[in-house]
């Protein structure tokens, strides 16, 4: 069984398609449940961010698994499978591992090097684990991806080179408005992105922030954190968006809502009576979009969406930092795959040791029957000698086969071992399933 990835992202599809594919936690659980109804799929999880929807699955067959995942996603977004595949990409086995490591490292983000995706990978895994839809393969893959992402961010300068989506959006806003110091902002959404937006606004010297959120208590908590930092702030529900827009210079919105939260009517009401020369920049970081497209056509209004952010030079990390990150990812992929190949041969090695132990026990029993006059001391010495000989004979080939199996293409060595020693595949599978004990080779160091 191998890992199969079916995905659509900002690199393969326009925002309109990503909007159709956007998912919340409930949608993700349904997608995984539907995928797992197929006997071809044994594990699955969904990674959904503002820029991508990816399904990672452990499948018994490539084409069959691909068909299952594609059909489920097509039904979810209301597209035909043929139309969806125009925007999709597929990665399998080693390529799927490399892709997830790159994603967790921020190398595949709209803003190269941003760190938010690492938390999104963690949440995708945590959610799948809570729903019992990941097993050993996706567990190990996800944990290693998180580790790789942390290593890339700690050992390279990609964090500084690749700014967050919010900081890039605010850079564009400042290019249009001038300094944000002393200005008024609206933050729509009081979750993690809202908190990040507020943090960047404080750094930019913003004077006043209207926090708008579906839940007023959450809006109040974020507003209070701004007040604690010396920034004037108040809290509003979504019904007050028009009021909040009235004196705003910049808006940052990222709610994860399934439909726009800022309507054209809201914008008309909020902008009525504003001086004609006063400009408003709206940073729409939502996916689907939080802002009705028609708002971009209003006089004095600039809407910055994710497609615009992707075109910004500051959204791309410095070449040297990105290259360093890619080198780390490549090395980690090689190490991970070597470990996986070695793990695959281990049950075969263990089954061989188990068979050798069974042969030894059978021969010792035969010896007991033939030489019943042997006393306990001599019988123990003979048993020790026989086991030592078997251990020494097996040690070099079993160590070597693990080394050979860890190299690319090394999966054939496990099969060769099974053929040479006529090992029963069921016995090997039993070891892999944990039904047989793992028997270590114990060499007598005194000899």
From Swiss-Prot:
Tell what the record comments on domains: Possesses an unusual extended V-shaped dimeric structure with each monomer consisting of three distinct domains arranged along a curved 'spinal' alpha-helix. The N-terminal catalytic domain specifically recognizes the glutamate moiety of the substrate. The second domain is the NADPH-binding domain, and the third C-terminal domain is responsible for dimerization.
Q: What does this protein do?
A: Catalyzes the NADPH-dependent reduction of glutamyl-tRNA(Glu) to glutamate 1-semialdehyde (GSA).
Indicate which residues the UniProt annotation says bind NADP(+). Answer: 189-194
Q: What is this protein called?
A: Glutamyl-tRNA reductase
Remarks, miscellaneous: During catalysis, the active site Cys acts as a nucleophile attacking the alpha-carbonyl group of tRNA-bound glutamate with the formation of a thioester intermediate between enzyme and glutamate, and the concomitant release of tRNA(Glu). The thioester intermediate is finally reduced by direct hydride transfer from NADPH, to form the product GSA.
BP GO annotations: protoporphyrinogen IX biosynthetic process from glutamate
Q: In which pathway does it act?
A: Porphyrin-containing compound metabolism; protoporphyrin-IX biosynthesis; 5-aminolevulinate from L-glutamyl-tRNA(Glu): step 1/2
Q: What is its EC number?
A: 1.2.1.70
Q: Which family does it belong to?
A: Belongs to the glutamyl-tRNA reductase family.
Query: What positions constitute the catalytic site?
Result: 50
The GO terms this record gives for MF are:
glutamyl-tRNA reductase activity; NADP binding
Q: Which organism is it from?
A: Mycobacterium sp. (strain KMS)
Superkingdom: Bacteria
Which positions in this protein are listed as binding substrate?
A: 49-52, 109, 114-116, 120
């Amino acid at each position: 069984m191998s890992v199969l990835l079916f995905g659509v992202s900002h690199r393969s599809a326009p925002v309109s398609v990503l909007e159709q594919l956007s998912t919340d936690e409930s949608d993700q659980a349904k997608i995984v449940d539907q995928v797992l109804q197929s006997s071809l799929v044994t594990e699955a999880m969904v990674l959904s961010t503002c820029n991508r929807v990816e399904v990672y699955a452990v499948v018994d067959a490539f084409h069959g698994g691909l068909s299952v995942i594609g059909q489920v996603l097509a039904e979810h977004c209301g597209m035909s499978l043929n139309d969806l595949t125009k925007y999709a990409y597929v990665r399998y086995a080693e390529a799927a591992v490399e892709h997830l490591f790159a994603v967790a490292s921020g190398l595949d983000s709209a803003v190269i090097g941003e760190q938010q995706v690492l938390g999104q990978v963690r949440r995708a895994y945590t959610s799948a684990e809570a729903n019992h839809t990941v097993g050993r393969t996706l567990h190990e893959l996800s944990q290693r991806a998180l580790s790789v992402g942390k290593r890339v961010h700690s050992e390279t300068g990609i964090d500084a080179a690749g700014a967050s989506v919010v900081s890039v959006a605010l850079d564009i806003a400042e290019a249009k408005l001038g300094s944000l110091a002393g200005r008024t902002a609206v933050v729509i959404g009081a979750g993690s992105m809202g908190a990040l937006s507020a943090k960047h606004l404080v750094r930019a010297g913003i004077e006043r922030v209207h926090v708008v959120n579906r839940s007023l208590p959450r809006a109040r908590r974020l507003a209070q954190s701004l007040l604690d930092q010396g920034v004037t702030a108040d809290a509003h529900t979504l019904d007050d968006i028009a009021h909040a827009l009235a004196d705003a210079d910049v808006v940052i919105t990222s709610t994860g809502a399934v439909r726009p939260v800022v309507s054209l009517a809201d914008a008309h009401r909020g902008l009525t009576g504003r001086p004609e020369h006063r400009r408003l920049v709206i940073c729409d970081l939502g996916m689907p979009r939080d802002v009705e497209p028609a708002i971009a056509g209003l006089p004095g209004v600039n809407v910055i969406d994710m497609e615009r952010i992707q075109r910004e030079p500051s959204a791309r990390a410095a070449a040297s930092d990105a290259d360093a990150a890619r080198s780390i990812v490549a090395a980690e992929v090689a190490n991970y795959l070597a470990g996986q190949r070695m793990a695959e041969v281990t049950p075969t090695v263990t089954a061989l040791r188990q068979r050798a132990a069974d042969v030894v026990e059978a021969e010792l029993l035969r010896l007991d029957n033939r030489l019943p006059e042997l006393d306990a001391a001599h019988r123990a010495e003979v048993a020790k000698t026989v086991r030592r000989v078997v251990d020494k004979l097996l040690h070099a080939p079993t160590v070597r086969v693990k080394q050979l199996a860890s190299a690319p293409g090394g999966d054939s060595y496990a099969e060769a071992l099974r053929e040479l020693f006529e090992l029963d595949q069921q016995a090997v599978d039993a070891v892999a399933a944990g039904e047989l004990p793992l028997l270590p080779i114990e060499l007598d160091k005194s000899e």
